[in-house]
Curated annotation (Swiss-Prot):
Cellular location(s): Cytoplasm
Reactions catalysed: ATP + H2O = ADP + phosphate + H(+)
Note on domains (UniProt): The Q motif is unique to and characteristic of the DEAD box family of RNA helicases and controls ATP binding and hydrolysis.
Name assigned to this protein: ATP-dependent RNA helicase eIF4A
Origin species: Emericella nidulans (strain FGSC A4 / ATCC 38163 / CBS 112.46 / NRRL 194 / M139) (Aspergillus nidulans)
UniProt enzyme class: hydrolase
């Protein structure tokens, strides 16, 4: 237990102190199984991101690890690669358990695990609310090596004894700050009580509020602490522009003009409210643009269909709210449009960090009214980045 550890006291800007600084700057030098390495490259990775360079090896070595990193830094692949490296494909039982705050994120993690583990003959099942319990029970009886899910459903499955814990080696908590702020603390503590004492714990969180630190002191043994600072986040490779729009009402015409100029392979358009998402969807549909929309008011099944269509490329433009910024990870997104600038600067990275992840190129275009200029300057300062006026030849850049 690390409860007396100075580094775990909350620091004013809620950052942990790193106690580990070894870097492995290529996947080849991580001594991964050949079939896993093949999956990593097939997925489209070329070189590890900042968090992957630091965290994969200590996790694979069996240390408890706390990693503080924002969305869009490659953390899903960090723990997916680590778990795949550690598990035994011949043992048909859950060896790595991953909990996440939302269904979308859980499904996203499942897709990444399956894609990277494509050549390994492993199974990964997602246990999430809003689906039939019987389906989960049947899938878990097959003994998938990795199970990912939301805390409520995972806890339920362990209690029903269909999710067996006796072979579990790793317990991974993704977006721990989000999970605890959504009121899952008790369920997470209950899950911990049901796991073998020897289970390795890996916790990932964008911020380190007191309740997250409490989890780390209670359940982690002498953890390796890794902080990926804000400036290491990947706004690299993403060209950021703004279009000055005199009035809010003119944004729609601006967007239509942009549609005419640019061939969009795939784009996400962010608005700040659900109502605005619906309004914009109606307006664009009326102008014969094909768009789909997604926000938190929708039924789970409906959201799944929309995400599926978007991932497969049959729908090209997705209009969404911040709530879902964390759950959208589509490799082909070449363009992110902030129809509204985010209400807080932290969400900027969640939104546009999608566009050019891990060295993939992307373009972000911000619609900025006079009222937004201050926020845009704050965003530039916060991320030490430059948002330039959109050039005439923007079509060549996308």
């Amino acid at each position: 237990m690390a409860s007396n550890d100075k580094g775990l006291e909350e620091i004013p800007d809620s950052q942990i102190e790193s106690n580990y600084d070894e870097i492995t700057d290529s996947f080849d030098s991580m001594e991964l199984k050949p079939e896993l390495l093949r999956g990593v490259y097939a997925y489209g990775f070329e070189r590890p991101s900042a968090i992957q360079q630091r965290a994969i090896l200590p996790i694979v070595k069996g240390n408890d690890v706390i990693a503080q990193a924002q969305s869009g830094t490659g953390k899903t692949a960090t723990f997916s690669i680590s778990a795949l490296q550690k598990l035994d494909p011949n043992v048909k039982a859950c060896q790595a358990l991953i909990v996440a705050p939302t269904r979308e994120l859980a499904q996203q993690i499942q897709k990444v695990v399956i894609a990277i583990g494509d050549f390994m003959n492993i199974q990964c099942h997602a246990c999430i609310g809003g689906t039939a319990v019987r389906d989960d029970m049947n899938a878990l009886r097959e003994g998938p090596q990795i199970v990912v899910g939301t805390p409520g459903r995972i806890h339920d499955m362990i209690q029903r004894r269909v999710l067996k814990t006796d072979q579990m080696k790793m317990f991974i908590l993704d977006e721990a700050d989000e999970m605890l702020s959504r009121g899952f603390t008790e369920q997470i503590y209950d899950i911990f009580q049901l796991l073998p004492q020897s289970t390795q714990v890996v916790l990932l969180s964008a911020t380190m509020p007191q309740d997250v630190l409490e989890v780390t002191t209670k359940f982690m043994r002498d953890p390796v602490r890794i902080l990926v600072k804000k400036q290491e986040l990947t706004l690299e490779g993403i060209k950021q522009f703004y279009i000055a729009v005199e009035k809010e009402e003119w944004k729609l015409d601006t967007l239509s003009d942009l549609y005419e100029t640019v061939t969009i392979t795939q784009a996400v358009i962010f608005c700040n409210t659900r109502r605005k998402v619906d309004w914009l969807t109606d307006k664009l549909t009326a102008r014969d643009f094909t768009v789909s929309a997604m926000h938190g008011d929708m039924e789970q099944a409906q959201r799944d269909v929309i995400m599926k269509e978007f991932r497969s490329g049959s729908s090209r433009v997705l209009i969404a709210t911040d709530l879902l910024a964390r759950g959208i990870d589509v490799q082909q997104v070449s363009l992110v449009i902030n129809y509204d600038l985010p209400a807080n600067r932290e969400n900027y990275i969640h939104r546009i960090g999608r566009g050019g992840r891990f060295g993939r190129k992307g373009v972000a275009i911000n619609f900025v009214t006079a009222d937004d200029v201050r926020m845009m300057r704050e965003i530039e300062q916060f991320y030490s980045t430059q948002i330039e006026e959109m050039p005439m030849n923007v079509a060549d850049l996308i």
